């Protein structure tokens, strides 16, 4: 809800990864560049929502901006595998019908999130991997880039630092941050989610994290919410974070929705004349935040770290993270705001 208690016409929430993100580790130039990139992503997505466009178009547009910025671990700027390769993952989901598309191990597509959407809309499948995903991307005519486009000096430095450690420290799920994502509510009351990542620095053996897995790193359902996650993917997979948050929201308010549905008159054939939508209901302020925090507590109890962004059909936009910081931002008709560090407060 907005500060005046009214449901916003639309809302967009984005993230650029969660992790050990502290002021002491960030130069003023890096801080400014990341905030500017987050604001550009919000601008791209919110322009679509403000003119009545779909939440699906908005999350794709926002994520594409972040994929094109080398500060983030997605698209250009993706981290290296242990063998010095780029393997990118992405997923997208439409809350109207729970259609979804996902890709993993992509090596040349400029914007993996757009490839995930093509999988959803132009193939009979949900999830494509590696050579098959690359082939499908080419067949769809999506822009392709050479390896050098994705590789940056900073990501190369991170890989060399990892390789210099004892072999027992070559795999650390907590080294992953910079994954990007977006969730949105449009003026029709529909939600959508999108997530894109280069994965984990030094990953081996075709490792797949939570980002391309529907229900772990991405989920959207008009009956509950839309979620995009970032962090230690192994733990997010084990908890099923994105689906768990949506399921808990849906379950908590199911009785309220069912009670409202019972008051709807039936037609001559005994069927309801219309279906009650979650966006038509007013639910307690803070409930989505409470649920997201609870699921992130479960991740922490298992030993995992990271964060989530959530948007609900009734207009809530929340963050929850158990790390020192998370690159994040949100927009609504009331305006745009971005933040990086854990102690920054934002208008909701």
In which residue ranges do the predicted regions lie?
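Alpha/propeptide regions of enzymes that mature by internal proteolysis
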Residues: 2-348
């Amino acid at each position: 809800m907005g500060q005046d208690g009214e449901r916003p016409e639309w809302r967009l929430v984005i993230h650029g990864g969660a992790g050990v993100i502290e002021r002491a580790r960030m130069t003023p130039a890096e801080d400014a560049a990341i905030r500017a990139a987050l604001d550009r992503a919000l601008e791209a997505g919110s322009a679509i929502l403000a003119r009545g466009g779909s939440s699906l178009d908005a999350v794709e547009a926002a994520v594409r901006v972040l994929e094109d910025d080398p500060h983030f671990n997605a698209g250009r700027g993706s981290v290296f595998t242990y063998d010095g390769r780029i393997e990118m993952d992405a997923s997208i989901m439409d809350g109207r019908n729970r259609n979804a598309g996902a890709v993993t191990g992509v090596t040349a597509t400029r914007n993996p999130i757009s490839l995930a959407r093509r999988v959803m809309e132009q193939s009979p499948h949900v999830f494509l991997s590696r050579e098959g995903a690359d082939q499908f991307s080419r067949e769809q005519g999506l822009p392709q880039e050479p390896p050098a486009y994705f590789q940056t000096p900073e990501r190369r430095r991170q890989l060399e630092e990892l390789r210099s450690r004892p072999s027992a420290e070559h795999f650390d799920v907590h080294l992953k941050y910079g994954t990007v994502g977006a969730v949105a509510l449009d003026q029709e009351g529909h939600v959508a989610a999108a997530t894109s990542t280069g994965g984990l620095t030094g990953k081996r053996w075709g490792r797949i994290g939570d980002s391309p897995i529907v229900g772990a790193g991405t989920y959207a359902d008009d009956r509950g919410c839309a979620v995009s996650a970032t962090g230690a993917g192994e733990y997010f997979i084990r908890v099923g974070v994105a689906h768990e948050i949506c399921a808990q929201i849906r379950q908590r308010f199911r009785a309220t929705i069912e009670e409202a549905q019972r008051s709807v008159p039936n037609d001559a054939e005994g069927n309801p004349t219309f279906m009650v939508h979650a966006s038509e209901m007013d639910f307690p302020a803070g409930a989505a935040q409470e649920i997201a925090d609870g699921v992130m507590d479960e991740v922490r109890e298992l030993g995992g770290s990271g964060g989530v962004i959530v948007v609900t059909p009734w207009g809530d936009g929340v963050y929850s993270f158990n790390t020192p910081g998370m690159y994040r931002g949100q927009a609504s008709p009331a305006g745009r705001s971005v933040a990086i560090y854990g102690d920054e407060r934002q208008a909701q």
